[in-house]
Amino acid sequence: MTNIGGGSFGTKKIRTERSILPEICIFLGIRITMHYSEHNPPHFHARYGDFSAVVSILDSSILSGFLPNKQLKIVLAWAQINQDELMQNWELMKNRKEPNTIKPIS
């Protein structure tokens, strides 16, 4: 992945082989991203080192992938706290608009 510049809301865009992923948040070595024009259900991607998971925004369940238990608990807690902001970003991205950054867990 390569940083290709900042967005108007302070998000970074990460280029992968398939798409550009706006970075929503980074905390404790965990990178949270979303894809433009993504399929339902509403979800985000969490990456920690070599591990990655797709997490449902609606119920904070793991749709696919794996994170170590400690990081998984942190990501799920963060997702529950920020569910409204995540859904707002999902709607923005469905309309191909730049998402907002979300505060890291403290």
Where do the language-model regions lie?
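Short, functionally important structural connectors and interaction interfaces within domains
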Residues: S19, R47-G49, V54, D59, ...
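Residue-level preference for alpha-helix termini and adjacent loops
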Residues: E23-I26, V54, S61-I62, F66, ...
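A short, structured beta-strand/loop element
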Residues: H35-N69
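Intrinsically disordered, low-complexity boundary segments flanking structured domains
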Residues: S19-P22, P42-F44, Q88-N89
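A cross-family signal for N-terminal binding/gating loops and helix N-caps
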Residues: M1-I30, Y36, G49-F51, I62
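C-terminal structural segments of small proteins and small subunits
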Residues: I74-S106
